[in-house]
């Protein structure tokens, strides 16, 4: 009987979520988010983010805090209530051309400068369909930070 219980216990525990050290991306939920030196409200604030949906890489966790790294390699801790699953990315090339379709042979829509925040709608192979301001189109994944 104990062997069956142990087997059932292992069957229903989501090991990937509980024991994983895999890094993954999230975005900042609010316009104002504090990056702290440690995983508690008792630690001092290192950086004060003022950009909603800024993508961050989750590197570690401690109770209700997540250790993050941003596109400028700043690291620190934020409370989980300040993170969102909404997908976004930052343009990391000096200029990135947005196309009307997921091919270099389609019409160019816009030139985006480095640092531009884009909302990800979907990704297909090496391309992502994005929105930013009044522009909608496709960007090469290689020019974006915030995707795995």
Residue ranges and their predicted role:
Residues 3-14:
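Sec-dependent N-terminal signal peptides
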Residues 17-37, 47-52, 59-101, 105-134, ...:
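SH3-family beta-barrel domains
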Residues 40-43:
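Second-shell loop/turn segments in exported
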């Amino acid at each position: 009987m104990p062997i069956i219980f142990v087997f059932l216990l292992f069957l229903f525990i989501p090991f990937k979520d509980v024991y994983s050290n895999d890094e993954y991306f999230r975005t900042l939920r609010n316009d104002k988010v504090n990056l702290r030196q440690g995983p508690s409200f008792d630690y001092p604030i290192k950086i004060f983010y003022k950009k909603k949906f800024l993508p961050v890489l989750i590197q570690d966790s401690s109770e209700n805090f997540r250790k993050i790294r941003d596109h400028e390699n700043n690291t620190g801790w934020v409370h989980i209530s300040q993170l969102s699953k909404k997908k976004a990315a930052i343009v990391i090339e000096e200029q990135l051309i947005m196309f009307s379709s997921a091919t270099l042979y389609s019409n160019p829509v816009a030139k985006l400068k480095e640092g531009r925040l884009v909302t990800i709608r979907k990704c297909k192979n090496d391309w992502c369909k994005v929105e930013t301001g009044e522009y909608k189109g496709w960007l090469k994944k290689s020019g974006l930070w915030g995707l795995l």
